[in-house]
Amino acid sequence: MSGEATVLAYHAPEEQEGLLVVKVEEENYVLDQDFGLQENPWSQEVFRQKFRQFSYSDSTGPREALSRLRELCCQWLRPEVHSKEQILELLMLEQFLAILPEELQAWLREHRPENGEEAVTMLEELEKELEEPRQQDTTHGQEMFWQEMTSTGALKSLSLNSPVQPLENQCKTETQESQAFQERDGRMVAGKVLMAKQEIVECVASAAMISPGKLPGETHSQRIAEEALGGLDNSKKQKGNAAGNKISQLPSQDRHFSLATFNRRIPTEHSVLESHESEGSFSMNSNDITQQSVDTREKLYECFDCGKAFCQSSKLIRHQRIHTGERPYACKECGKAFSLSSDLVRHQRIHSGEKPYECCECGKAFRGSSELIRHRRIHTGEKPYECGECGKAFSRSSALIQHKKIHTGDKSYECIACGKAFGRSSILIEHQRIHTGEKPYECNECGKSFNQSSALTQHQRIHTGEKPYECSECRKTFRHRSGLMQHQRTHTRV
């Protein structure tokens, strides 16, 4: 359980640059000399699993079994280093993960929340991310759409090899289609065809397959829809008897897809198409034909596991991997697998060193777009995370979580050497270096070591000659803020 281990592992931001909802690049510090956790931050999870999976048959007797359990428990919880509150947080986080669905457990273990509150925040952000429409990779998204459509046979009525019809022919086709629909009262056989139409609209919109020759007064989205819908074989749309034929659910819908209430406005018709999920059929009544405009991005694809709905089938497929735990995208360098291709692309930049996202203000480059957005908040001053108690705003969600401990009085990180308690694990780790004498920050110029990164930064100014603190009165500069403050007193005395 990587999430449990993070109470032991400190994620210290190298720079307090503002933040997005996403995890930042962090510098991991781990309190450990005994078990080599500095080399392998996943060791805590290994110890936890060994403790939980230990069985009586692994020992020669009850005394050895108890002794071995005690040893494994200490390796996992490390009571010689952690306070009661920290151990309690570990146990609570473990139990919280245990009650989650397996797919969410795996996702959280990969993202390693520091505590239960952060785990909840991550899950809420994941839910928001899945609900938000995101632009699809045109090539990959188009392949997924067509593969899915071909597998269900929904495109058998389409001529995929023929070019897009001229716009004038499409308008005629749509008019004929509208008349055919209105002539058939009751159930209609065109459900499957309309399903194909919706898929094609999304494919064409995604791939930006727009032909020239826009008509006057025609909107951009209408033209894309008409070009997509014009490719349907009109003769096949008109098959079926007046009483209507039930159309069974497509094979891919048996588990993954559910067509919610689907209302779509076509330039030549205004209608409401009702989906009967219980029967797996579609019906249309002449009394239901209304004069209303419909949201073209209505969510049509519903997950049968959790009920969440999506406007594109590709997003449902991506969401389903949370439930199935499928990770089809593996890194060739280290073998790590991901459920999203975008996650793999971002991960591979660690190996390649590529940083394609550059800040237009200062030129600093980043591996991911989220890191750039977070960095941009330094320039814009944006602070989207606000405390409900005092109204103070923050640029990072993690900073807000830490701030809230001021109101709750939570100081769950206690030093076992002196009993002093802290609200953040990072402060505890820095404090414990007083007792351990650890100095992990070493100057490359002279080899001198320090217990805090800020102390190393100040020291390096001796070598670089940098004096960033300037007196506004006389323009004299100083290496340290304390030197500037002491100097400014000479002006105030005068």
Swiss-Prot record:
Transmembrane segments: none annotated. Keywords: DNA-binding, Isopeptide bond, Metal-binding, Nucleus, Repeat, Transcription, Transcription regulation, Ubl conjugation, Zinc, Zinc-finger. SUPFAM superfamilies: beta-beta-alpha zinc fingers (SSF57667), Retrovirus capsid dimerization domain-like (SSF47353). GO terms for cellular component: nucleus. InterPro entries: SCAN_dom, SCAN_sf, Znf_C2H2_sf, Znf_C2H2_type. It is found in: Nucleus. One of its GO terms (molecular function) is RNA polymerase II cis-regulatory region sequence-specific DNA binding. Disulfide bonds: none annotated. Residues 48-130 form the SCAN box domain. There is a cross-link at residue 197 (Glycyl lysine isopeptide (Lys-Gly) (interchain with G-Cter in SUMO2)). May be involved in transcriptional regulation. Belongs to the krueppel C2H2-type zinc-finger protein family. This is Zinc finger and SCAN domain-containing protein 30. The gene is ZSCAN30.
